[in-house]
Amino acid sequence: MQQLTIEQQNIRAKIYQKFAHNYPMMITMALSTIILAIAEYAIWQDINFLLRVLSCLISSSFLTAFYFLFTRISRRVSKDILENMIIFKSTRKPSTRILLKDDETFSKIKKHRIISKLKNEGCWELDMKIMNSNNKPYINAINNATSHILEVTRHDGILFERNCNYGFARNLFGGLFVDTLISVVIMIVLLCISNVYWQWYIYILIVEIIALLLIAFMAYREGVDYAIRLYDVYLEY
């Protein structure tokens, strides 16, 4: 089994942090700043006032506080809403679903090879005949085995890349979801105080909702590709 050195692990951690966490937050925070700026101008219609507001928004203390809060909320949203309530609610996570009897991603022979290898390594004790989504012990066995598989496949560069891609899509969804909530709140406020400018946010919301659907699909595909690569690398090592 190939092992990553401490230095390699640290390098990968920095790359993942930058690509899967920082970049999505920077993109969606920039969008939220634009959304707030449009709202300020719609309310006050004063470009000088808008410039003063923007100067406050880009101050270091505000950015630090906003980034911390925005990041925490977005990550929670991406985990609780995107993973648990949308893309993997009915189908389970790809790494689990792929080994179920009714899933056709892998052939029966390939599934048996994976299970047999897990048995040989002492990570599996259940009968393969109970490979279905209604069998909780089987699902738990897959989840436990996945931890072992992740450990022995950690060295693979392509697997790491796909993990970064999935993390990027997942966190981008979380940040954009928060932006969409901000847009909804602003539209309601403008609707109460203006007869015209709230309509701007209808178009913004349409674009955001379409983007959310596309990103959710992208995250789902990245998750499936990651799971396929995970088991392929496991069989090869």
Q: Over which residues does each language-model region extend?
A:
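N-terminal first transmembrane alpha-helix
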Residues: M1-I109, W200-Y203, A219
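Polar/charged alpha-helical tracts
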Residues: I6-K14, S116, N140-N143, C192, ...
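Short, flexible coil/linker elements and helix-boundary hinge sites characteristic
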Residues: Y23, I43-I47, E121-E125, K129, ...
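Hydrophobic transmembrane helix bundles of membrane-integrated enzymes that assemble
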Residues: T33-E40, S183-L191, L205-I209
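Charged, low-complexity, helix-prone segments enriched in Lys/Glu/Asp/Gln
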Residues: S74, D102-D103, K110-K111, I158-V178, ...
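Charge-rich cytosolic interhelical loops and cytosolic tails of multi-pass membrane proteins
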Residues: D80-I158
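Membrane-proximal, non-transmembrane alpha-helical segments
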Residues: L126-V196
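Alpha-helical oligomerization segments
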Residues: L191-Y237
